[in-house]
A protein has these predicted regions:
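Core catalytic alpha/beta fold that binds nucleotide/phospho-ligands
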Residues: 1-119
């Protein structure tokens, strides 16, 4: 689980702009969030999801796990995680076969819960 202050993300967006976006989010995540009326809330939820996923993987920013190696996607239905590179390797090394992601927002916070499961 992780929580992120929406205002903190809004400040980073204002201060660092595209440099912040390119460092943390995939192109797909940026496109999705920019379509939202409250994009800072959507970016904050994805930021929290990435941090919660790193906790679930037990790595933080190590063992080849980086921001863009964890992606929040939403095709149909609820958002899901996709792992890439070192994050995918760690996911597989743990014997995980799928992940569950929940996102929620309040006025101040975006909160993410991540579970890694073995079938």
């Amino acid at each position: 689980m992780d929580a992120m202050e929406i205002e903190r993300i809004a400040d980073s967006l204002e201060r660092y702009g595209d440099r912040f976006l390119r460092h943390v989010f995939t192109e797909g995540e940026v496109a999705y969030c920019r379509r939202k009326r409250d994009s800072a809330s959507s970016f904050a939820a994805r930021f929290a999801a990435k941090e919660a996923a790193m906790k679930a993987l037990g790595t933080g920013f190590s063992r080849g796990v980086y921001w863009q190696g964890i992606e929040v996607v939403r095709h149909h239905g609820p958002p899901q995680l996709q792992f890439h590179g070192g994050a995918l390797a760690r996911f597989q090394a743990l014997g995980a076969t799928r992940s569950l992601l929940t996102l929620t927002h309040s006025r101040e916070l975006s909160i993410a819960h991540v579970l890694l499961l073995r079938d």
